[in-house]
Amino acid sequence: MTQQDRTAVQYHKMTETPIPRLILSLAAPTILSMLITSIYNLADTFFVGRISTSASGAVGVVSSLMAIIQALGFMLGHGSGTIISRRLGSQDTHAATRFASTSFFTALAFGVVLAVVGLATLPDFMMLLGSTETILLHACAYARPILLAAPLMISSLVMNNILRYEGKANLAMIGLVTGGLLNIALDPLFMFGLGLGTAGAGIATALSQTISFGILLYMFLRGKTVSQFRLSAVTREPREFLQILAGGAPSFGRQGLNSIGGMLLNIAARSYGDAAVAGMSIVSRIFMFILSVAIGVGQGLQPVASFNYGARKYHRVRQAAIFTLKAAFALLVVLIAVCWWNDENLIRLFRDDPEVTAVALPAFRYQCFAILLQPVIVVTNMTFQSVGKAGRATFLACCRQGVCFIPLILVLPRVLGLVGVELCQPIADALTCFISLPFLLAFLRQLEQMDKAEASHAPAQL
C-alpha cells in the first residue's frame, strides 16, 4: 500500500467510523497503556516500600521529577500532535512531517538540558522537590538514573502522542506496554536480586524506558506512520515552533503545576514526618492508577476531535465529547466502588505501617468522592486542546493546580493541620469541575451552531 493509500484509509476511518466504536477502538489500547504505566508506578511504590518508610517517601519526591519530564514531553507531543492531526484531516502530509520532526529533535535537546542541570544539583534539587534529610539519600539514588534517561523519556512521550493523534493507538501501546512490563519485572531483580536498593528502582525505570524509546522509534523509521522524522524537515520558522508550544501549553501547564503541586504537598506533609510523606504518596499513586482510565478514554477522544475538527465535521466532535464524558464516568464509578470496599488493604499493600495508614486512609476516602468529577475536567480540557483552542485549554489545564490546589495547600494545612493536607486535592477537584462545566456546555452549543452553518455552506467562526 502506498503512502497516499494509507493516508486515504486513515482519513476514512477517522471521519466515517461511528463515534462510539471509533473512540473505544482508540481508547482501549490507550487505557491499557495508561494502566500499565500506572501499574509500574505502583510497582515502584510497592517494591520500594519493602525497604523502609523513608524509601517509600522518596517515591513521592521523585514523582515530582517525573512530572517535569512529562510536562516537557506532553507539551511537545500534544502541541505537535494536535497540529499533525488537524493537518492530516485537511490532507497536508508535508506539514505533518515538519511538525513531527521539530517536536522530536526539540525533545531530545530539552532532555539533555534537564539531565545536565538535574545531575549537577541533585541533592538541592531533591530537597526543592520536598525531600526530608532522611529521605534524601533514597531520593538521590532513585532520581539519578531517571535523569540520565530523561532525553529518551521525553522523546518517547512525543512519539507516543504523535502516534495517537495519527489514530495509531495500537502502535503507541506496544512501546509503552513493553516498557511498563519490563519495569515491573526489573524492579525486584535490580532492587533485591542485585542488592541495589532504591537505586535499582531508578535503573529499572531508566532501562525499561530506553527500550520503550527504541520500539517507538522503530515504528517511525519503518514507515508505519504518515509523519516522519527527518532532521532536514525541522522547521526554520519561529511561528511554527511557537504553534507547537502554544498547542502544548495546556499540557505543560498541567504537568508543570503537577510538579509544583507535588513538591508543595511533600513540603506540607513532611512537617508531620516521613510517614505523612509516604502516606500521601501512596494515595496519589493509587488515584493516578484510577484516573488513568478516564485519561485513557479522553486520549481516545483527542485524535477524533482533532481530525474531525480539521475536516469540518463538527457534529462528530460534539458526539465524541458527550460519549467520552459518559464512558469515563461509568468506568470510574465501577473502579471507585471496588476500591472503597478495599481501602485499608490497598494502602497496607504498599506500606504496612500504622502511621502511614493513619495518614493515607482519610485522604483516600475523601478522594473517592472527588474523583467522580474528573470526567468533566478531562473532557473539557482535552476537547479544547484537540481543536486548537490553546487559550481556553491552557487556563483550564492550569486551573486544578494553579488556581485551586496550590492556594489550598498553602492555606489549609495552616488552618486544619494534617487534615488540611488530606483535604486539599478533593476540594481542588470539586472547584475545578465547577469552573470547567460552563466552558464545556458553551462549546458544545457552539459546535452545534457551527455544524448547522457548515451544512448550509455558511462560514462559521468561533
Where in the sequence are the language-model features?
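Hydrophobic transmembrane alpha-helices of multi-pass small-molecule transporters
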Residues: 68-71, 183-188, 213-217, 289-292, ...
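Short alpha-helical transmembrane segments in multi-pass integral membrane proteins
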Residues: 1-27, 84-151, 193-249, 305-370, ...
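Helix-terminus/linker motif at the lipid-water interface of multi-pass membrane proteins
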Residues: 35, 39-57, 126-133, 189-198, ...
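Transmembrane alpha-helix boundary and packing residues in multipass membrane permease domains
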Residues: 30, 34, 46, 63, ...
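Transmembrane helical elements of multi-pass membrane transporters/channels
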Residues: 25-44, 145, 179, 208-212, ...
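Small-residue-rich hydrophobic transmembrane alpha-helices
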Residues: 56-116, 153-172, 279-343, 374-396
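Short runs within selected transmembrane alpha-helices of multi-pass transporters and secretion channels
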Residues: 77, 146-164, 172-180, 201-216, ...
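Residue-level signal for short hydrophobic patches within transmembrane helices
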Residues: 16, 20-39, 43, 65-72, ...
